[in-house]
Amino acid sequence: MDGTQDHTPPAEGLFGRPLFSDPMARALSRVGVVDVGSNSVRLVVFDGAARSPAYFYNEKLLCGLGSGMSETGRLNPEGRVRALKALHRFQALAEGMGITPLTTVATAAVRDAEDGPDFCEEVLRETGLKLWVIDGEEEARLSAQGVLLGWPGSFGLVCDIGGSSMELANLSDGAVGRRLTSPLGPLKLSGIGGGKKGLKQHIRTVMEDLHAAMDHETGKRLFLVGGSWRAIAKIDMERRTYPLHVLHEYRMQPRDIGKVADFIAETDADDLRARCGISSGRMALVPVASLILRQLIRTFRPKDITISSYGIREGMLYEQMPQALRDRDPLIEACRFAEAKDARMPGFGKVLYSFVTPLFPRAGWQRQRIIKAACLLHDVSWRAHPDYRAEVCFDYATRANLGGLKHEERVFLGLALMHRYSNKRDGTRFDDLFDLLPGPDQQEAEILGKAMRLGAMLWLQPGEQPASLTWRPNLKRLELDLSREAAPLFGEVAEARFGSLATTLGAEPQVKITR
């Protein structure tokens, strides 16, 4: 989770006290938020108090409220009717789920339209929903808070694009700093004259003004938020034949933006839409959005680019979190929540972590948190059919909604969990994903998985440490120290697993019974 600071672990044991058992966290049972944007209207219901958001329900409609507004100054009539119907539906759904009142915000289109106040009154009268019309700086703040939901302690620049506006916000040590708003939304730019040349010049002028207002800062990590950016990322995945179709934490380098912009310009839009699974309404905005992104990269010169699937709606959830929950690692909290809910022996993950850590003496804090996550998740898929359990584990790690994970870390976690249940990984349907992880890291994930596979055989009473590992790389010797109480657990299967772990390490296995 680069771009963040290392935080001192809590005092309550290796993993700290689980925040989801705290009364303040439990109060966040279900939270419903509605975002009335220039292009889409969306309802999201977050479930539970895990630090990574669990999406209980997610529905959107591309209404195009801001379509044509640059010419008329008013909300799109058809979009207005469709948005009102969607809000009727969302309110009814919320009542059925028992999550009223909904928190409902409206952004640039409603904010700037002549008939925006009239639309707000109509929504209140017809649905009972109070639309909170937020200004551009508040929109930037909430979007940046959404990024913090996935990456606490982040540094960088957040850029959120909507249909009618584009917002910027600085992040420094997990705090939202300077915020700016601009009219650089694809729908808003439809009325700019002078053809493509005039449009490019207008974008460049506005972008340079934004850069000056941000004190000409360059070289930061750029977090991209918004549907048009996600659509461009999908297209870049298609261009690169990228194997992991998870948009959150998808990384691009500045040089990639010119390549994908050219790819968009040179490829038939309908063909791209079909290949990438992008709606026609969203695809219509992509060509202009790619021009905006290209100029953004030229002007701000970021060091790298990260897609954030978390934005304004997640920022609204973050707003309601107690600070103690905000400060926790979203990955570890989500894994602890999963262990408490699904593992056969909740709490054994901490014991297992102590058991496997001697094998990784040089692991930095980023790798240590992935090892912790693996230990917490090592048993949550026990209900899966034994023939498919290893693949289910890998699929869960690589595709689940887990925050604070780079793509290569997802693959590392998935491989470790796969080897928790299987010695081999050849011939699976995930072979193309393994290449996202360098060879030495693949071996380290295999070592972790086989160590967990062994440790899972050595259960005693909850909280007890029945065995310990000592890795002596200079001697190429792996020692297993068993307590007398645990010695009967070391049967033929456990012995075979210990031997497999030693073989992967290139070590001679040695067993001691002490204590």
Residue ranges and their predicted role:
Residues 34-40, 159-165, 225-228, 309:
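A short acidic Gly-Thr/Ser loop motif
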